[in-house]
């Protein structure tokens, strides 16, 4: 694949490939380079990691651009490359465009690089990045060129070799010194000393004089991290990024010796100070001067406000960087010439750490080989993402498939006859030789630039020098936020004598890049003035604020939609990278590659006197322009005419849309229903795009995964509820939890796209119906449709969210978005809606009602915007929880069913627990005229911990709502769906019931109660369709017929005496394996009863006021009884006793008959036992934690466990029958009354496990608690059964 390619200028575009080339010429990610602008180079956009624009990815994907990362893990680099269509290959692969490594490269790897391949390190870069080598190189330059010329390091000694010199210096000045390992980073192994005896000489270390007069801001010490890019060492080309980081210590600076060991005071490394408890981080990318990490521009602006000379400061910083790199230039340039086959194969980003003292003199601390690209704060992401994107653009990745390379020879014109770039047009002539191609390139360039421009500038240059000259010019055209500090128009005169690598390339660049610069002979003051103006320009660039990625994204989209960006014959800059100054406009006017953007002044083509006279006119305006203009703005310099008065004409693109919809809505305007639906559809499309994007630069941590999981859960909830209101059936296939996170996001995005399609169709149908009626209400006029459509095309997700939130707040309802009902009843295994069409539409309107926040920022990254439209239920649920602790009189709100976090049947896993309350079946259901109110809730086999009333459910990696698995079909009920449905819902209250009441009607005496902490309180307003209830009852009837019930389920506590009869057939074994018989009341044909005895007080207890009953001792309804009641009410057949005795259990029948005959005696027994043990058990009730509450991890469904043959968890010993009672299976008559009295009298007072005591405690606890509605629990461990 040739890098320099000639083309026939007379060739016409006649083939389809020609048309493709033309269509790609204006692509925002392509910049054309080479002699005839035939070589496409990729342009990177920092905001691509947020947008995941397919238009940006298409170039990289088309040419199979690839990268590999070796011995490091840079998520930011990976995310930027992936967003631009690159794909990652194995570290051992040889087909790549970029190798990003964290260590030095071996010579044999460098030798095999092709011209299109690039690596991020130069050979022998350790000459700069190792502290000992850096020290030696600078000391050598001090000896050669003078100490003052290279006095950029504090006084330093290399130990143990120079220990004697160090002791001699210490004896003269007993100040503090700082010790550093020669090859470490991030502050590891760094400490301060004030005596040579404190130093360990076991390894090589560097000892430097501690700068005890650092520049302080608010009494805190700080240093500056600068990002320096070197693209070539022969010739030397250095760029400094216009933004950096100021890193502050976390403890106020104090020179006292007592604080010499306090690293948080003396060290400014982020890796050290982030461990301090005083470290402050800023979460707003727009705030750059807060916390322990500032932007460099914010620091410079602060110093300028304090009256400091920031222009001179940054000029000294540039001087320090240039001299540092020059000190290692010879060694690195020699290694490049030896090992690197192509000049453009290597580039390197250095991290310079500079400390500024109180006199504004910068001191070099160290140079980092691979500066940290971690983004621990939004400010890091804004600066580092912009810097990396601009660096990749400057380096220049040629759009070429790495697998198609045919040769690795260093002379790249010889690629001409081997491979062609797919972008390039087919040549009708024969392949050109290297010399022919180069000459034709030069001719073509001369034609494009005009006679006398570039044509004359290359006279006398070799082919290699021409290629180097063109590459350096093209790099500067793509520099973005980088500022080229070497070479400039003055650097050769200042630093030329310091260069040790004696080649002609540096001099060639100095003379050819700035060949038109004014000679300063006889006018040295003009030379100084030119230097000052250049320094002011650079200082203004360093001080201006960097735009956030979100603003860049909006600006680029706005400029692309308007298509107003002018085209230049040389530069095709992206929107973010067009930072135009007066000197840059001169370059665009002349369209010559040999003009320097930042260093060239307009007066260079005029006389010295003319510069002196007119420089005062444009220099202040230039500085003011850059200071008041943010980086990467959209201003365009249209004209720069020196002869016409040196005025700068600016054309500013309008960033704000002309049509301000929010202003119209606030001025009593309104949207029509169709416009509201269109805006909502556009919002959902933004959400879909956000789901389809990759993780970007986010850290794959537990918190990030939890947040992503929560966002997907919001989408799932929305789809389930919204699809239920569609007129058309829509199948929702939800992703499995076993899939990868990104794969689940992709599936959800696909499902959301399907929903949007159906939603848009229904919107069109609604529009057609309205157009046929020809009757429009006054409020349906809405805003101007053309302006509205333009707003929809340009609006961002944040703007749409703001409009929809305001519209919902203004109209008091969001039902227009999703409707209020559907034609048919649509249910799923997680939620239900009203079965009848039109039933309580206000219910759904309340569910989708949006509660906007009090304050809303449109510039934030909206990662959870969908929750504004789907989680209003959560907001109402929190209000319910906060009020639930107020007692039975707490008013319950209506909560949408989408807040249901999990739905469990007997074989499903539990979800987060919420407090629930009882509700009643409407009396209007024909098939159930007298059915008592029940709850068809189930409890999972392993109950999860419950939330305390009023507690807030905070998402966490292990405890947040999960994305449901399986398929969700809108259509008729299946048996499984209906079962899950009826077991996960509460029956709604009748319309005559008092709003917010949680009590049961006292006339409904046959009520069974239950608690379930996995259910939400969000289903109060829901009703069952009659057909749905009938289907479920039929299923329960079939289940009842085939189920074998445990006999122990319906034997009262009095049957404990039967255990002394030694019953046969294993009845007692099953009884002990199940729950205590006391907890399982018998359900008689006439209704549920609590005892087989005739208790005259029972009806009174059943109908007593609920307010007088304890919540801790409330009654419970077991699943078996609930199903039996449902069965009896549905079929009209009175079910038999749940225990059907077999042929071998006749002894039990006899025992029960005997018990019936002993009712009066038992009653007397109870009275006497109560009187005898009143002193022991009188003050005791049955605690929740001992009798009624099982362990959270234990199984709670006793009836199900018994029916399935599994052993449920046994209760405490004091309610379990004595082991001796089951020693024999021979039935015996019950003991007479006198024997029982004697036995009870002989029992010790400390024993509370006797049958009489148990019966007394149980009876006293059950009687006052019969049929108490359980609204909430005050015991965190209270497990609802």
Curated annotation (Swiss-Prot):
User: Where does the record place Acidic residues bias?
Assistant: 584-604
Positions marked as site (Essential for specifying initiation versus elongation step of the polyglutamylase activity): 186
Which reactions are catalysed by this chain? L-glutamyl-[protein] + L-glutamate + ATP = gamma-L-glutamyl-L-glutamyl-[protein] + ADP + phosphate + H(+); (L-glutamyl)(n)-gamma-L-glutamyl-L-glutamyl-[protein] + L-glutamate + ATP = (L-glutamyl)(n+1)-gamma-L-glutamyl-L-glutamyl-[protein] + ADP + phosphate + H(+)
Q: Where is this region: Disordered?
A: 577-614, 1072-1114, 1199-1281
Gene Ontology CC entries for this record: centrosome; ciliary basal body; cytosol; microtubule; nucleus; plasma membrane
Annotated TTL domain residues: 62-407
Q: What does the entry list as the binding residues for Mg(2+) 2?
A: 366, 368
- EC supergroup of this enzyme: ligase
Q: Which cofactors must be present for this protein to function? A: Mg(2+)
Q: Where in the cell is it found?
A: Cell projection, Cilium; Cytoplasm, Cytoskeleton, Cilium basal body; Nucleus; Cytoplasm
Q: State its Enzyme Commission number(s).
A: 6.3.2.-
Decide whether keyword Transit peptide is in the record. no
* Residues binding L-glutamate: 247, 270-271, 293, 384
Stretch list, region c-MTBD region: 378-488
Q: Which GO terms describe its molecular function?
A: ATP binding; metal ion binding; protein-glutamic acid ligase activity, elongating; protein-glutamic acid ligase activity, initiating; tubulin binding; tubulin-glutamic acid ligase activity
Q: What positions does the entry give for a protein binding?
A: 186
Tissue-specificity statement: Expressed in the retina, found in the rod and cone photoreceptors (at protein level). Widely expressed with highest levels in heart and skeletal muscle and low levels in other tissues.
InterPro entries registered for this protein in UniProt? TTL/TTLL_fam
Similarity annotation: Belongs to the tubulin--tyrosine ligase family.
Role description:
Polyglutamylase which modifies tubulin, generating polyglutamate side chains on the gamma-carboxyl group of specific glutamate residues within the C-terminal tail of tubulin. Preferentially mediates ATP-dependent initiation step of the polyglutamylation reaction over the elongation step. Preferentially modifies the alpha-tubulin tail over a beta-tail. Required for CCSAP localization to both polyglutamylated spindle and cilia microtubules.
Assembly: Interacts with the transcriptional coactivators NCOA1/SRC-1 and NCOA2/TIF2.
> Domain note for this entry?
The flexible c-MTBD (cationic microtubule binding domain) region mediates binding to microtubules. It is positively charged and becomes ordered when bound to microtubules: it interacts with a negatively charged patch on tubulin. The presence of positive charges in the c-MTBD region is essential for proper binding. Arg-186 is the main determinant for regioselectivity, which segregates between initiases and elongases in all tubulin--tyrosine ligase family. A glutamine residue at this position is found in elongases TTLL6, TTLL9, TTLL11, TTLL13, TTLL10 and favors glutamate-chain elongation, whereas an arginine residue is found in initiases TTLL2, TTLL4, TTLL5, TTLL3, TTLL8 and favors initiation.
Quote the protein name from its UniProt record: Tubulin polyglutamylase TTLL5
Q: Which organism is it from?
A: Homo sapiens
